[in-house]
Amino acid sequence: MALRKATKEDVDHLSRRPLGLFTQTRIGAMPRVRRVRVGEEGGRKVCLFSVTAPASKAGSNTSATFDHFVAAAVELPERIEGRLAILRRGPLHSPRKPQFAEAKDGVDARVLDDYHVYASDPTLAAAVLDGALADWLVKDGHGAYYEIVHDLAVAYKGRNFMLTPRKSLLGRARALADRVPATAGS
């Protein structure tokens, strides 16, 4: 699989996706999508990218702090009507929380021990987070945040330096996409 530098249209299309990662920050600024690479693997579109989001301003408007994320996205085999965020619990780096409610009903308790789950529809969370996906999240899915948005599975993590292995995130996004139950889209 060879990834190529994204065109302006590719970046614009990705930036318009309703990912929690792209929501307006608490200081009213919009995150910026950067370093986008796109390609195809096994007949599905894949994408690697970085996001820089202003987190706070210093006393004068001349300085700000930023949250930095690296992410990978893989096209789902089947479209899902709705959005789901699976955000790992932990004190170190807070993810971009989506604008819908936390879902707990019908979600595997093992998943809830390790992750906060948010869904546009609570029944979607229960339908998606069972079986193989729940097992993978608990056993091998640690270390990243996940979102499923319509036809896209995204894995991302905060980064403090430029050397975060982006290809490993692509593997996580691919594993997530491969484990979403086919019946969840209906």
Give the role of each language-model region.
Residues 2-186:
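Charged, low-complexity intrinsically disordered regions
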